[in-house]
Amino acid sequence: MELNTITPGQGAKHAKRRVGRGIGSGLGKTAGRGHKGQKSRSGGYHKVGFEGGQMPMQRRLPKRGFKSHLLKFNAEVTLTALEQLGLAEVDLLTLKQSGLVGQIAKNVKIINTGSLSLAVKLTGISATAGAKTIIEAAGGSIA
């Protein structure tokens, strides 16, 4: 078998249905759209979520909660990611350069996911209580 001899399986490819090309085709004249009405017109059909004039569902239900714009400035880094980084001293700049956090991140928190056997000194980075105990047990520190 060669790459230039491979063909699609039988019935895998379908010819595009051509509509509006004469009565002999079976889909001529109205082209499967029926007679008259909004759906038969070009560009004519309701927008998504329109319910025929009745109050739509997304307006009947109450608003709930909000999305904080501050979330994009806060980032989380796992202990496993910190281990894979393999650095003795870690700060916000090194995390940005390594690509672990985005460039717009202002605050970073180390979370207790995974394990850490490397002694890491963190500067300007916070950690959860569980992550803090693991970092200190491995010989690291948080400043």
Swiss-Prot record:
Residues 1-59 are annotated as: Disordered. Keywords: Ribonucleoprotein, Ribosomal protein, RNA-binding, rRNA-binding. It comes from the Bacteria. GO terms for cellular component: cytosolic large ribosomal subunit. The keyword Secreted does not apply. InterPro entries: Ribosomal_uL15 (IPR030878), Ribosomal_uL15/eL18 (IPR021131), Ribosomal_uL15/eL18_sf (IPR036227), Ribosomal_uL15_bac-type (IPR005749). One of its GO terms (molecular function) is structural constituent of ribosome. One of its GO terms (biological process) is translation. Residues 21-31 have a biased composition (Gly residues). Belongs to the universal ribosomal protein uL15 family. PANTHER family: 50S RIBOSOMAL PROTEIN L15 (PTHR12934), LARGE RIBOSOMAL SUBUNIT PROTEIN UL15M (PTHR12934:SF11). Binds to the 23S rRNA. Part of the 50S ribosomal subunit. This is Large ribosomal subunit protein uL15.
